[in-house]
């Protein structure tokens, strides 16, 4: 199927990058730099911590999910029935990570070699959710410790105290990771519902910058 290419040139520095609309609906941004020794890739979805109330369609009833579920979902996507995505990245030499913000969740890696193999891993694990009662409950302790760590961070607490003072009802006032109490309510069914709502390719963007062949990247996608 045809892909829609567009070349975009930045007004400030004059560099150009390619924007491609993949037949799957995925938006792909490509910034080839031949002299770069490291290549960076990031796959993001427009889904963050503030999206805890949503409708899956105009006909569907509104849904409300526990605070921190977007961040919880980010953690759980790295785990599959066959193993851990970090282990797969280690075999290609790539350094991988992820983060959740108020409005987005992103999965990323950097590498100096085996780019296309690493890209396949990224696209594979993000599109292959695997949640069970056992694995979801196990993660509660891990994320609970992360929440307590941020509770001891003065800068983090000042920021959220400020947001709570400014916003009396908007979900931006709540911690991105949720609370120990809210994450205890998260179930595999809730994770699948959020995944199926927000992790569709039309709601996602893939961006690469570094030394690569744009056509080969699109072949992987």
Where are these regions (language model features)?
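Charge-rich, well-structured scaffold segments of protease-associated domains
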Residues: 1, 21, 80, 84-221
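His/Glu-rich zincin catalytic helix
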Residues: 1-85, 192-221
């Amino acid at each position: 199927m045809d892909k829609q290419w567009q070349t975009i040139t930045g007004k400030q520095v004059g560099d150009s990058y390619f924007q491609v609309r993949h037949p799957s609906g995925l938006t792909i941004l490509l910034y080839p730099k031949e002299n770069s020794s490291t290549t960076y890739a990031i796959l993001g979805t427009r889904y963050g911590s503030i999206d805890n109330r949503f409708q899956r369609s105009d006909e569907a009833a509104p849904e409300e999910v526990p605070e921190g579920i977007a961040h919880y979902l980010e953690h759980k996507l790295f785990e599959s029935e066959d193993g851990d995505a970090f282990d797969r990245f280690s075999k290609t030499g790539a350094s991988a990570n992820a983060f959740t913000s108020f409005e987005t969740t992103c999965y990323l890696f950097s590498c100096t070699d085996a780019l296309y193999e690493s890209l396949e891993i990224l696209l594979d694990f993000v599109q292959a959710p695997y949640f069970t009662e056992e694995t979801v409950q196990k993660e509660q302790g891990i994320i609970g410790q992360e929440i307590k760590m941020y509770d001891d961070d003065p800068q983090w607490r000042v920021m959220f105290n400020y947001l709570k003072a400014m916003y009396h009802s908007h979900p931006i006032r709540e911690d991105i990771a949720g609370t120990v109490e809210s994450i205890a309510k998260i179930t595999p069914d809730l994770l699948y519902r959020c995944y199926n709502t927000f992790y569709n390719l039309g709601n996602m963007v893939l961006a690469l910058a570094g030394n690569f062949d744009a056509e080969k990247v699109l072949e992987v996608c």
